[in-house]
Amino acid sequence: MNSPAPVGSPAPVSAPSLDVAGLAFAYPDGHQALFGVDFRVERGERVALLGPNGAGKTTLVLHLNGILTGGAGTVTVAGLPVGKRHMAQIRRKVGIVFQDPDDQLFMPTVREDVAFGPAAAGLTGAELEARVDRALDQVGMAEFKGRPPHHLSFGQRRRVAVATVLAMEPEILVLDEPSSNLDPASRRELADILRSLDVTVLMVTHDLPYALELCPRSLILSEGVIAADGRTGELLADDTLMRAHRLELPFGFDPRSVTMGA
């Protein structure tokens, strides 16, 4: 739990984008995936969630917008507890971009895919079109508005998938392996887009150089707990920590030689 502010200290300007406290969860078959996860992400931060397969990363992400509930502990998004009472608001505030963009693109055109969420939330007319146009502009896909998604490249489809989430104007953008299956040019384009967004980002990835490039801070989730929380470059340069949690950098990659961008 977070300690109360000392007497006489100024009140915080706003609640953090995400506050996870004591989160534990077991599946119905008895498998315990999370054992008490604690962390917070401030507004505007870009944070990488790292960890080996089976660490509990997917289980954690599915708690952030209430897809999974019922374990111990709490998840709070922009001051709202994740639960039935606030579920509609939470799902607008937490946008998840899945690893496979085809899981999110199912309408005949790019425009219809991006409009789907806001339209379901009640937007219509000029307000809806403005929301769609703004989201497509943010990912550099405005010129493809009338195209069928299946006619686009994989990298373009991933950018449209990001736009479908941005159209909901989320508090937090959660990305699951955003660099997977991208060629170098698409990888660079997506990185530039993510850096330009005025939104909190939580990036789940095994791509450690991409995490270093985009996220000043990283969390290592291992065996259902946060094993480390710190500056990405410092964590990746800690050989003992990396080995302990089965994380490996590409051959020849030295995080100490990389200058972090903003």
From Swiss-Prot:
Binding site residues for ATP: G51, P52, N53, G54, A55, G56, K57, T58
Superkingdom in the source lineage: Bacteria
Keyword Transport belongs to the record: yes
Enzyme class: translocase
Main location: membrane
CDD domains: ABC_cobalt_CbiO_domain1
Compartment(s) of residence: Cell membrane
Pfam families per UniProt: ABC_tran (PF00005)
GO cellular component, one term: ATP-binding cassette (ABC) transporter complex
Family that this chain belongs to: Belongs to the ABC transporter superfamily.
NCBIfam families in the record: cbiO
Role: Probably part of an ABC transporter complex. Responsible for energy coupling to the transport system.
Record-given protein name: Putative ABC transporter ATP-binding protein SAV_3608
Native source species: Streptomyces avermitilis (strain ATCC 31267 / DSM 46492 / JCM 5070 / NBRC 14893 / NCIMB 12804 / NRRL 8165 / MA-4680)
Lineage: Bacteria, Bacillati, Actinomycetota, Actinomycetes, Kitasatosporales
